[in-house]
Amino acid sequence: MRRELLLERIDKLKATMPWYILEYYQSKLAVPYSFTTLYEYLKEYDRFFNWVLESGITDASHIAEIPLSVLENMSKKDMEAFILYLRERPLLNANTTQNGVSQTTINRTLSALSSLYKYLTEEVENEQGEPYFYRNVMKKVATKKKKETLAARAENIKQKLFLGDETEEFLQYIDTEYPKKLSNRALSSFNKNKERDLAIIALLLASGVRLSEAVNLDLKDINLKMMVIEVTRKGGKRDSVNVAAFAKPYLEEYLSIRIKRYKAEKTDTAFFLTEYRGIPNRIDASSVEKMVAKYSEDFKVRVTPHKLRHTLATRLYDATKSQVLVSHQLGHASTQVTDLYTHIVNDEQKNALDKL
C-alpha cells in the first residue's frame, strides 16, 4: 500500500475512535511503531468496538462515544464472547466455505487488544501519575497456539526455502527465464521494474532483514562499498546489517536506473521507489509481498518475504554453525529464536540415523 493511501486510511479510522485510542496511537507512534503496524491495530480496534456496540455492552451509539469504563469493566466472559464471535462470524456469510476465522487471526486480534490494555493499565499516566485503571482483563484470556514441535515446524518451513544454489538460481530465473513466459504487455511492465525487483529480492536473500526494514531504507542507509545497510529494528533501534556480496551487482544495477526510471528528485530519499502517475513514491510492503509471491510461485513455491529471511538465516547457520552470529544478523537479542535453524540444518542427525 502506498504511504499516502496508508495514512489516508489511518486518518479515516482515527476519526471514528475514542479519545483514549488516539492517545494510544500517539504514544506508539513515538516508540516508534510503523504506520503499517498501527493501521493493523486500528483495524482490530474498529472490529472490537463494533462488536461492543452490537452486543449491547454499552449504550453508546458510535465508537467514538464508548467510554473508558467499558474497557475497565469488561469481564472475562465478555472477552470470551468476543472470541467466539470472531470464530463463528464467517458462518454468517453464505459465500464462505470456511468454518471460522483461523486461530492465527484470532491471536493477532488478541495481541492488539493486549497491547491496548497494557497501555491503559501500566504505561499511560493521568494527572496523578497513575494509569487510567488497573484491571487488565486480557491477562485472564487464554490464547491457543498451534501445537507443533520445532522439528516439525522446521521441516514445514524447509520446503519453502531457497537453500544452497537455489538462492542464486531464483534470482537468475527472474532475470532470464520468467520474462520468456510473458505477453508483450506484461513484459513491458516487468522490464520497467526488473532491476528494482531483483534488487529487493537479492537484498532480502543477502541480509535477512525484515520486509518493513527493507522498504523503509533510505539512500543514506546504503553503503555498497562496505556492503552494509543501516536499518531501524523493532522498537526503533538502529542497527548495522552486513549484506552478502552476491547482492551487490543487483543493487548497483538498480541504482544506475533509479533516478531516470522513477523520475526521482533529490527530495525522494527512499531507496526503493515505485512510480504512480509520474510521481515517485516509496514502495510499500504490500507491493513487495505480491511481487515476491508472484516470482517465487512461478519458480518453485509461493513464499513470503519472511521466508527469504528464513532462507538467509538457514544458509548462514549452515555455513557457520553459530547461533550467535545468526541472531546478530537477524537483529535478535537472544539465540533462542534461532533454534529453528539448527533443526532445518539437521544433516548430522540424519547421517547418524543412517549409520544405525
Swiss-Prot record:
Belongs to the 'phage' integrase family. XerS subfamily. It comes from Streptococcus sanguinis (strain SK36). InterPro entries: CB, DNA_brk_join_enz, Integrase-like_cat_sf, Integrase_catalytic, Integrase_recombinase_N, Integrase_SAM-like_N, Recomb_XerS, Tyrosine_recombinase_XerCD. It holds the Pfam family Phage_int_SAM_1. This is Tyrosine recombinase XerS. SUPFAM superfamilies: DNA breaking-rejoining enzymes (SSF56349). The active site is at 210, 234, 306, 309, 332, 341 (o-(3'-phospho-dna)-tyrosine intermediate). GO terms for biological process: cell division; chromosome segregation; DNA recombination. Residues 16-121 form the Core-binding (CB) domain.
